Amino acid sequence: MTAAHPVAQLTAEAYPKVKRNPNFKVLDSEDLAYFRSILSNDEILNSQAPEELASFNQDWMKKYRGQSNLILLPNSTDKVSKIMKYCNDKKLAVVPQGGNTDLVGASVPVFDEIVLSLRNMNKVRDFDPVSGTFKCDAGVVMRDAHQFLHDHDHIFPLDLPSRNNCQVGGVVSTNAGGLNFLRYGSLHGNVLGLEVVLPNGEIISNINALRKDNTGYDLKQLFIGAEGTIGVVTGVSIVAAAKPKALNAVFFGIENFDTVQKLFVKAKSELSEILSAFEFMDRGSIECTIEYLKDLPFPLENQHNFYVLIETSGSNKRHDDEKLTAFLKDTTDSKLISEGMMAKDKADFDRLWTWRKSVPTACNSYGGMYKYDMSLQLKDLYSVSAAVTERLNAAGLIGDAPKPVVKSCGYGHVGDGNIHLNIAVREFTKQIEDLLEPFVYEYIASKKGSISAEHGIGFHKKGKLHYTRSDIEIRFMKDIKNHYDPNGILNPYKYI
């Protein structure tokens, strides 16, 4: 990897208390021979040279790195089934992997687990324009799903900054929330059916198109957000929304978070049915993004403590523009905003969204970042970011080099009470980690929040569920894992 993409420390070395499960078999030539008997050369990547497998072993945040020497890239559900049956019989540990854009270390190995990549399962299976039902392989890239549906006057009900890389099966397996949760809700409500390969190779094929089905337990819900710990999602059936005929956005500069909350209340009241996103960013987030984007002109003339991006989508452009123009005038007259800009065309719309979507990549561009994803009541939403920034400043860790922390950045989805806290760093150090944890989790627990709003648990938050979940809930989760995966071979050392 180049200097722009530094190599993370091996997870096994960074976390020496985590030990490889001695019950798991070490891959040998007999295993390779079996996989070569069922897969083509294009479906196997095997090398002793770490750099050749680096993109499969290292996570996007450059924080976790495994030691897998075998990447399997099957192109069918049947092949996934054969792989899982063999691995279960032989007790070979497996990590399912989509686009590897995960943010909690869930999609890369910890030790020498086999990586099962879904990238070759990338076909659209079916689309019904009447019901809006979209069926596809798990490895379809979200960007391609969006483009396919756009060409058929529909949209995928989820959008993420990582849409160019993340895969549909991956976002389902992690229950990603995204930028339009406020309008379209969660994947638990949008996914109609799944095709899943269990650890023993059995296939649950319920990739149906029914909006209603009240016959027994809704098993698909167990696999949405399970992070590949109890089954490998290979196919998805999901409800696509009709493509809006009118899209618009406004970008505001605001001086305090109390005003952000007041603006949200006003937006819900006055924009109501056309409101599709309400995002906020703090000063640190935008400062990082300005430095990262460099040549892209910033939409506002002045710097502010907070910024808000509001998106509207509807079926009548004239109606929507009138509502948004009136809203902009009213917020200006009432002094709720310090400065604002309304998109004039599609190019403006895309540019405004670039300032929000680029924040994670900008924060990660200095060398790495510590990332937290939390749910809180709206009145408490920004308080965790302020508390962490104060803590890092008091320790003298934030500033120009050689200080390790570049900035502490808070941003997120006001509409669903979700804040992302990114600590942009030049290097990962134990001093920073000790200042952040368990402080962040204890703070969230004290506010009755959730330590993971949408990014999941993975390796990063394993063992920390008690900050959000009760003992009985955790026990039930372990029972589910033990039932579906008694040998523990699927995505071990993570989740529960």
Curated annotation (Swiss-Prot):
Alphabetized UniProt keyword annotations: Cytoplasm, FAD, Flavoprotein, Isopeptide bond, Oxidoreductase, Ubl conjugation
PROSITE patterns noted in UniProt: FAD_PCMH (PS51387)
GO molecular function ontology, one term from the record: FAD binding
Subcellular location: Cytoplasm
Domain FAD-binding PCMH-type as annotated: residue spans: 64-243
Catalytic activity annotation: (R)-lactate + 2 Fe(III)-[cytochrome c] = 2 Fe(II)-[cytochrome c] + pyruvate + 2 H(+); (R)-2-hydroxyglutarate + pyruvate = (R)-lactate + 2-oxoglutarate
Cross-link (Glycyl lysine isopeptide (Lys-Gly) (interchain with G-Cter in ubiquitin)): K17
Gene Ontology annotations for the cellular component aspect, listed alphabetically: cytoplasm; mitochondrion
PANTHER family, A to Z: D-2-HYDROXYGLUTARATE DEHYDROGENASE, MITOCHONDRIAL (PTHR43716:SF1)
Misc note: Present with 13000 molecules/cell in log phase SD medium.
Protein known as: D-2-hydroxyglutarate--pyruvate transhydrogenase DLD3
Gene, per the UniProt record: DLD3
